[in-house]
From Swiss-Prot:
One of its GO terms (cellular component) is PTW/PP1 phosphatase complex. CDD domains: WD40. Keywords: Chromosome, Cytoplasm, Nucleus, Repeat, Transcription, Transcription regulation, Transcription termination, WD repeat. It comes from Gallus gallus (Chicken). WD repeats lie at residues 19-58, 105-144, 146-184, 192-231, 236-276, 280-313. This is WD repeat-containing protein 82. It is found in: Nucleus; Chromosome; Cytoplasm. GO terms for molecular function: chromatin binding. Belongs to the WD repeat SWD2 family. The gene is WDR82.
């Protein structure tokens, strides 16, 4: 089944899970699309089975809190950042609920975490104005970059380069093998005082970069030239909430939630809004991602919703 405007318009909430007492701050699908794992401000980690459509188990990180949870490539392991007492990144085995390794180094809250799509490398960005490069096999930081402001960062789909959004006005592209030489490309954007950048993602085809903000718009830029292709708005975000924006796996559509529980979808090529879907969420949709392998997506406030199409084109 191919994603089209009509298929997207047909998506409806198939299941809602109320496992959390506070907002879900992040979730991540496993690369095979079979499970999704969430982190929440209530200090819990919930693992869901996407095929059976049910929660499988819940773990807790009471002492440190849990945010920015990401699957690694090894089965049943995740990395996540703390949102409480320290800024160490933790590598957890879900299998026996034991920490495999800690990654200390950041001195302020970690605000970005991206796992390499191809190996055990990952990068983190922090309010201490640094981006750190790590390898899951070693607790020691493999590389460090000092920046002029708050960074957001992400790997490209090949795992060869990463992009850093700095100070909500610049995108810098780095070659992973020689990032200490500085960026090989820098794209300066029009600075907007009204909001901050909250995230950065590559499309699966590597041609586009999506910049999320805590304002009322998101930007789509050309990953090679840095030109702004589209600015998408018209959704509610009056309280400067961090709303996650995502590509569909075919790189054709862009989705974002809003503070009123609706999901807005645009065609990345034409820039036209193709759908507004009502998730009936009780709070702002802070997390939204399409499943990498199956025709389903998930959205979250303090509840988790799984969506399915109601037509089969």
């Amino acid at each position: 089944m191919k994603l089209t405007d009509n298929v997207l318009r047909s998506f409806r909430v198939a299941k809602v899970f109320r496992e959390n007492s506070d907002k879900i701050n992040c979730f991540d699908f496993s690369p095979n699309g079979e499970t999704v794992i969430s982190s929440s401000d209530d200090d819990s980690i919930v693992l869901y089975d996407c095929q059976e459509g049910k929660p499988k188990r819940t773990l807790y990180s009471k002492k440190y809190g849990v945010d920015l949870i990401r699957y690694t490539h090894a089965a049943n392991t995740v990395v996540y950042s703390s949102n409480k007492i320290d800024d160490t990144i933790r590598y957890l085995s879900l299998h026996d609920n034991k920490y495999i390794r800690y990654f200390p180094g950041h001195t302020k809250r970690v605000v970005a975490l991206s796992m390499s799509p191809v190996d055990d490398t990952f990068i983190s960005g922090s309010l201490d104005k640094t981006i750190r490069l790590w390898d899951l096999r070693s607790p020691n930081c493999q590389g460090l970059m000092h920046l002029q402001g708050k960074p957001v960062c992400s790997f490209d789909p090949e795992g060869l380069i990463f992009a850093a959004g700095v100070n909500s006005e610049m995108v810098k592209l780095y070659d992973l093998r020689s990032f200490d030489k500085g960026p090989f490309a820098t794209f300066k954007m029009q600075y907007d005082r009204t909001c901050e950048w909250t995230g950065l993602k590559f499309s699966n085809d590597g041609k586009l970069i999506l910049i999320s903000t805590n304002g009322g718009f998101i930007r789509l830029i050309d990953a090679f030239k840095g030109a702004v292709l589209h600015t998408f708005g018209g959704y509610n975000n009056s309280k400067a909430v961090t709303l996650e924006a995502s590509f569909t796996p075919d790189s054709q559509f862009i989705m974002i939630g809003s503070e009123d529980g609706k999901i807005h979808v645009w065609n990345g090529e034409s820039g036209m809004k193709v759908a507004v879907l009502d998730g009936k969420h009780t709070g702002p949709i802070t997390c939204l991602q399409f499943n990498p392998k199956f025709m389903t997506f998930a959205s979250a406030c303090s509840n988790m919703a799984f969506w399915l199409p109601t037509i089969d084109d």
